[in-house]
Every structure is written in structure tokens, then in C-alpha cells.
A protein has these predicted regions:
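Noncatalytic nucleic-acid binding interfaces
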Residues: 54, 119-120, 142, 146-149
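Active-site-flanking segments in enzyme catalytic domains
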Residues: 2-38, 42-48, 59-64, 74, ...
């Protein structure tokens, strides 16, 4: 808003036919008509505009107004609290999380006890190390502490525990060998996901996630009939041809309708869904490209999350606030997870998946017309992966479990925002 006004107000020919009083009156009328402008902000804006000596003074008033609006729409405390209450209604409580943590703790200890017993005679020194690790695991309190300890203990770089477990494999039964292999596979340090849970625990968590999200869909302000009608507009001949002769794959009509209902019908930027066998993507031209023959619709939900953000600029401010709240350390430390030719910038965060912390630096155009990417920043990122990763949780069992167990707050944010969007009418 302010960028556009700045261009107008600094172009001395654009407003040559308007008097200062006419500019003031038009500015106040415009602000009065904006739904996203809290009425509490308007008196100060009117006063600042009235006192302006020239167009630059009016622009200064607009900048102050936008700053207050951004701070207001970027507040996530209220919606996150709403989402937390919704999760509680579906059994996702601190007590439930602690049960999962205890189960996970017990499972790891049981596996390490196999190692300690196997090496008691063969290598007493290594057995003693394992017993100390067991003691530390049993003493850890809270999911965050357990996750952090396991990610460090099983890190093959600089820790001897994985090697000790490998040594113990020579002295165990086939059943115990399988148990140790699973232990190493799940907890050896992975910078993308950090740690994993067993299938039983993942299923237990995801069942409750689906319950909460399906309830939000069922209670939507958008009827199923209206949502299916919207979804039908994307079932083109191209889509039908891509699906011809294929068994299984995404039920595009149902998935789109569910997303539309969950978000209160507040997706306006999507104009086309195309079949694409490469990496899925969404863009500002209205496109979502995914493999429609995939058995899992998580990519479709992920990409629709971008259009949810595109369609509701206030959600970008909320996403920025969410990211700022999850910075690891005093200030963001950015890493490139892409390549030199096509960098993908993420910052080190407390989130369960590094991709959640991805930012999109704004671009600038040089005097020669070359597009250059500016330095990565959270405050000025032009888009995020926050709502994309949140919607993905509907079909991604592993990501959903890891996010909730890590205490990301991602699902709470989504459910709170979904309720707000559905109540907006």
C-alpha cells in the first residue's frame, strides 16, 4: 500500500489536479473503507492527515497506519490460543504429549539395555557408557529435552554411541538386531527431521490431528455443495487427460473441497491446477502444479497453503510473527539448503523441520535490468512455508507427529486461523 502511494505522492504530475484538502479527504475516506483497518486506529490517522502540510505528510500518516495494521494482523497469540483449545477438544493435551514422550523414552531405554547386556562381558567400558546414557535419558524431563538429548547422543559425528551399538550387533539375536537397526535408523542425526517416532506413536498422534482438522472442515461456514462446485472449476480436460487410464491417485475434487471448507472459502488466487511429475510448486500466476497420480495428496495441500497466504495478505504477517518466535538464538542465522544457482534460504530454528523456516528474499532490479535477490530476512520475506507446512500435516503422518511432539505450535496456528477465516463472514 505505502509503496504504491509513495510512487504517486512523489510524482508531481500524478496529483497536479488535486488540492491538498482533496487529497486529505480522499485518504480518510479510503482508510474508512478498508476492512483490515481496525476502527481504533482511525482517529490517530485522521488527526495526522488533517495536520499534514503536504503530500509527504499524508504519506507519513499512511506509513504509521500501515505499521499499526501490520502489528495488529501479525499478532498470533489469540489465534494460537484458539487452536490450542481446539486440539484439547480432540485429545491433544500436554498429558497426551507426555504419554508419547514416556513411551518413546521407555522404548529407547529398552533397546539400549540390550546393548549394555550384550557388551557387559565383551566390552565393560562401552557397557558402562551405555548405562550412563540410559540414566541421562531416564532423567530427561519434557519432550524438548528428550528430543535434544537423543539428537545429540545418536549423532554419528563426534559421538561414540552409534559405534558402540554397531559393536553390540555381533552379540545379539536376530530379533534384537532388528530392534537395534531400527534404533539407529530413527535416531541417527538427520538435519532435516532431527528425530523420528515409531509407527504406533505416529498413528496415535495423527489420528487426533485428523479428528481436529476434519471437525473444522465439517463445521465450516462453507457448505459441502458450494465447496464441490468450486472444486469442479479446476477439473479441466487437461486434468482429466492426465488421469485417464490411471488407477488410484488424488481425488482432486474432494481434496480441493476439503481445503476450501477448512479455510472458509478464503482462497481467491488459485486459477488452475495442472498435472506435473516434477517437483510440485505454486506461483502468483494462480497455478498449482502437482503429480495428480500420486497416492498421497500432501503435496496438493502444501501448495494450496501458498495460495491461502497469497489470498490473505494478513496471513503473511502472522507467518512472519510465527517465524520470529521460533528463531534459535538471539537473531536469525541463515543457511542455504539449495545451490549457488538457485538458493533456498532457511534460518536455524526450534521447529521440527528446517523447511518450515524457509524465507523468500525480496528481489530488486539493477540499473541494467538484472533481477537480484536481496539478503534473506524474516521481516521482509515475500512468502513463507508456514501455512503450506501446516496444511501438509493433514496427509503427512510423520510431519504431523514430529511437529506436535516438538511443540512447534504450527497446527494450533492453522486451526485458530481457520476458525477466524470461517467467522469472517
Amino acid at each position: 500500500m505505502v509503496q504504491r502511494l509513495s510512487l504517486i505522492f512523489t510524482d508531481h504530475t500524478a496529483l497536479v489536479d488535486l488540492t491538498l484538502d482533496e487529497m486529505k479527504e480522499a485518504s480518510i475516506q479510503w482508510a474508512d473503507r478498508q476492512n483490515e483497518v481496525n476502527s481504533d486506529f482511525l482517529p490517530a490517522f485522521r488527526k495526522a492527515v488533517s495536520k499534514a502540510d503536504d503530500a509527504r505528510g499524508i504519506l507519513k500518516a499512511f506509513k504509521a497506519l500501515q505499521s499499526r495494521v501490520n502489528k495488529h494482523v501479525g499478532d498470533i497469540d489469540g489465534v494460537t490460543a484458539e487452536g490450542r483449545d481446539i486440539l484439547k477438544e480432540h485429545g491433544i493435551t500436554p498429558e497426551f504429549i507426555d504419554e508419547i514422550r514416556t513411551d518413546m523414552q521407555r522404548e529407547v531405554v529398552s533397546s539400549l539395555q540390550i546393548v549394555a547386556r550384550a557388551l557387559a562381558d565383551a566390552n565393560p567400558k562401552s557397557a558402562a557408557i551405555v548405562n550412563r546414557v540410559i540414566g541421562d535419558i531416564e532423567a530427561s524431563e519434557g519432550m524438548g529435552a528428550l528430543k535434544l538429548f537423543l539428537s545429540r547422543a545418536f549423532n554419528p559425528n563426534g559421538n561414540i554411541l552409534p559405534g558402540i551399538i554397531g559393536e553390540a550387533k555381533k552379540y545379539v539375536s536376530e530379533e534384537e538386531l532388528e530392534q537395534l537397526d531400527q534404533l539407529l535408523k530413527r535416531f541417527s542425526y538427520n538435519p532435516q527431521t532431527r528425530w523420528q517416532m515409531n509407527q504406533r506413536s505416529m498413528g496415535s498422534v495423527h489420528e487426533k490431528v485428523l479428528s481436529a482438522m476434519n471437525s473444522a472442515i465439517a463445521n465450516s461456514s462453507v457448505s459441502e455443495e458450494k465447496a464441490l462446485e468450486w472444486a469442479d472449476s479446476f477439473i479441466t480436460e487437461e486434468v482429466e487427460e492426465a488421469r485417464a487410464g490411471q488407477n488410484g491417485g488424488i481425488d482432486l475434487r474432494k481434496e480441493l473441497a476439503d481445503i476450501y471448507r477448512l479455510t472458509g472459502g478464503k482462497i481467491s488466487t488459485l486459477s488452475k491446477v495442472v498435472h506435473h511429475q516434477g517437483r510440485a510448486y505454486a506461483n502468483l500466476n494462480g497455478v498449482v502444479a502437482v503429480n495428480l497420480n500420486d497416492e498421497n495428496a500432501s503435496a496438493l495441500w502444501h501448495e494450496l497453503g501458498h495460495h491461502l497466504e497469497y489470498s490473505n495478505p494478513g496471513l503473511l504477517e502472522k507467518a512472519r510473527s510465527f517465524l520470529k518466535a521460533n528463531v534459535e538464538g538471539d537473531k536469525p542465522s541463515f543457511v542455504n539448503i539449495g545451490g549457488r544457482g538457485k538458493p533456498e534460504w532457511c534460518f536455524r530454528s526450534r521447529l521440527s523441520n528446517i523447511y518450515m523456516a524457509k524465507v523468500y528474499p525480496p528481489a530488486s532490479v539493477s540499473n541494467t535490468g538484472k533481477i537480484r535477490q536481496k539478503s534473506p530476512t524474516i521481516s521482509k520475506t515475500s512468502a513463507t512455508e508456514v501455512f503450506s507446512m501446516a496444511l501438509q500435516l493433514y496427509h503427512d503422518k510423520e510431519a504431523a507427529a514430529a511437529s506436535l511432539m516438538n511443540g512447534d505450535g504450527l497446527l494450533e496456528l492453522l486451526l485458530g486461523v481457520a476458525k477466524e477465516l470461517n467467522n469472517a463472514d
